């Protein structure tokens, strides 16, 4: 717990005291709602009503609606509301969508470009989501579920079956951590903790719940000066001929490929793709640590599985 909190503080300090100030000097700005002009607030609110509001689903908890399921590592907005008639405080949850852009461009001119984060847009436009209802407070939070395999499962006779079952069940595995913002309103945090049966040790007040990977969107702006030159790997001499049978190449000799200096696409990806389409291949066994979002290897493995290969 201490290590995680320390790491989070280090990341936040690096972002807020180094990266963001350095980008500001280069004309790349990150704005809060209060930084926007009135016309800009209306522009962003219009974007919210047209493009974001239709995909949001608020789930309020009352006698007829139980506490909603919250998926692993998804960020949510917890909101405390007052019922119009009784004045009773109730909880509502809105999942923060990750399928859409996390950054909205507010200004872009010769002086630079300014962005506002999706979460900042959400918390300042909740009145469109809950018209006529008093919003008492709101809090961004995230849960972590236990998706580890049990130790005895690692030695099961059919590990493939265990993994498949684990993947099905992990969605509903127990929550082991609740992350909330620093100085979050206690009622919301306590309510969520109670519903998820968490103790105080399971609740982490984080200095930032920022999704640091979302900053990858910012790299798409046209600022060559701020980017490293793209790396173009060379193609290994044995794989230059794309029509040559890769299995024949491997049969003739061992081939050593050095990544990232030599192309992964023309070697490993090509090897897996060829295996997936070759009728003489009955099984593909590979250990993948992680893949990119649009991985050609995953596409090849899916194709192989759909065509009866193990």
Where are these regions (language model features)?
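N-terminal localization/anchoring segments of enzymes in phospholipid and broader phosphate metabolism
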Residues: 1-310
